[in-house]
């Protein structure tokens, strides 16, 4: 058993309370390799932002759970080396079983998500409560989910979304004891968050997605005043990255994300954690593809992973400073 406290990490409890009171959201950036982790820490130290290092089950397998634990500890020390002791959470994204959540807690995660949203309601409650009961013994915080997000990201796949029913949230939170709640109000996983028929097109022919269901969010806030709410699938899919990828050998068709002005609006509400994964993938892929085309003789990984890391840092700083409002809150 490894305690996250021995790694220098924190859980989400105080972080979320401050975010709700301050009207901003904590960035939850998905991470599975060294360059991503370096970019996240560099950006959040420079922006003086708290951060959640978010790891999916697939990323945990990819990075190896033991290496990941030491990478997280290294991230804490790296932030100090850069001159800022920012609050850092190590969080399991979309845990789908008690066993996986327990394993992460035992290996030093400070926060876990148990996603039983695909199960019948009472089974979701029972599974979530089982994880909460174990996690809280070690002061690890737990995120549950009500409602289903469409899209594909790592092992998470759903063809259709189901909006969160505000009438269920009080019962779910009281029965499970979760510390935060992921909801479905129209966000979606992946870089193709909406089908073309769900969108309109602007003068340049780029898809314009439908508005998020802020009415549902408002109802949930009324039911659970001051309770931490989480948005998954909140990448904006910057079209400049899509264009670079597609003009350098890629084939991303009709890629569309959540407009940043809608995320700014959400961050000012009870939404205190906003998950961003696909934007980071796009930033890295755009930088690497451009180098492969422009410098075809290059074969030193540092010469393409380094610029990809720099592009990631720029993206993450933008999210902290101009979208989520977390800059200066560490």
How would you name each of these model-derived features?
Residues 1-2, 142:
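An N-terminal domain-start capping segment
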Residues 2-7, 22-28:
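Terminal accessory/targeting
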Residues 2, 246-249, 258-330:
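C-terminal alpha-helical cap/extension of soluble enzyme domains
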Residues 26-30, 90-91, 113, 229-231, ...:
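Short catalytic-loop micro-motif centered on adjacent basic/acidic residues
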Residues 29, 57-64, 89-90, 308:
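Short secondary-structure transition/capping motifs
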Residues 7-21, 34-59, 65-85, 94-228, ...:
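Alpha/beta enzyme core
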């Amino acid at each position: 058993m490894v305690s996250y406290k021995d790694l220098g990490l924190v859980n989400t409890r105080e972080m979320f309370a401050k975010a709700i009171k301050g009207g901003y959201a904590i960035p939850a950036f998905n991470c599975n390799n060294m360059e991503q982790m370096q970019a996240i820490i560099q950006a959040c130290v420079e922006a003086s932002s708290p951060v959640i290092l978010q790891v999916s089950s697939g990323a945990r397998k990819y990075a190896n759970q033991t290496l990941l634990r030491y990478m997280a500890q290294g991230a804490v020390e790296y932030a100090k080396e850069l001159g800022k002791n920012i609050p850092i959470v190590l969080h399991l994204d979309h845990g789908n079983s008690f066993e996986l959540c327990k394993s992460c807690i035992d290996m030093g995660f400070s926060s876990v998500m148990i996603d039983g949203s695909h199960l019948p309601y009472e089974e979701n409650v029972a599974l979530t409560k089982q994880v909460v009961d174990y996690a809280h013994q070690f002061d690890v915080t737990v995120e549950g989910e009500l409602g289903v997000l469409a899209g594909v990201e790592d092992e998470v796949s759903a063809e259709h979304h189901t909006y969160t029913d505000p009438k269920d949230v009080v019962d779910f939170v009281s029965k499970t004891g979760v510390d935060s709640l992921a909801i479905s109000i129209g966000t979606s996983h992946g870089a193709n968050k909406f089908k073309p028929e769900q969108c309109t097109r602007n003068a340049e022919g780029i898809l314009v997605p439908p508005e998020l269901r802020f009415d549902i969010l408002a109802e949930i806030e009324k039911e659970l005043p001051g309770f931490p709410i989480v948005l998954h699938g909140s990448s904006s899919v910057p079209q400049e990255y899509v264009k670079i990828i597609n003009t350098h050998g890629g084939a991303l068709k009709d890629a569309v994300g959540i407009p940043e002005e809608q995320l700014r609006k959400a961050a000012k509400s009870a939404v205190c954690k906003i998950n961003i994964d696909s934007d980071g993938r796009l930033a890295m892929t755009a930088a690497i593809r451009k180098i492969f085309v422009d410098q075809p003789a290059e074969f030193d990984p540092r010469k393409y992973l380094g610029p990809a890391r720099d592009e990631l840092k720029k993206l993450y700083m933008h999210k902290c400073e101009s979208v989520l409002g977390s800059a200066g809150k560490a």
